Amino acid sequence: MDTNEEKLLFRDEVFQIVGCAIEVLNTLGHGIVEKPYENALVVEFGLRKIPFRQQPAFGVLYKGQQVGLFVPDLIAFDSIVVDTKVIGRITDHERGLMLNYLRITGLRVGVILNFEHRKLEWERIVL
């Protein structure tokens, strides 16, 4: 897939997710622990009729054998891993984790949402 196609992959859906996150941040405020933001996103997704799964489990395989589970915060539109954070800033560590999440789930797009500051920090990651 070329760069232009990657930029367009689930573009509108990602903007809908970010819109929900901005609404959550504006309503709850910034800097509380992660779980209330995740749960508020669930409420907002429901209000906006965005399909989602909360805390679905995916097997982590090693040489064909399951060696653990990965449980992402949310999967939206059956296609996008959504990871909520309350951290100083999104770094290569979080980007690397998201790439691993995408490999484990078999999905192509992830969104990292950071609720630490008054302005939402977010990044879209494409595998």
Region annotations inferred by a language model:
Residues 49, 66-70:
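A short, glycine/Asx- and small/polar-enriched loop/turn
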Residues 85-127:
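Nucleic-acid nuclease catalytic cores
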Residues 46-61:
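A short acidic/basic microdomain associated with nuclease active sites
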Residues 29, 52, 72-90, 101:
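Conserved catalytic cores of phosphodiester-cleaving nucleases, focusing on short active-site segments
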Residues 22-36:
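A short, highly charged nucleic-acid-interacting micro-segment common to nuclease
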Residues 1-8:
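Short, low-complexity, charge-dense intrinsically disordered segments
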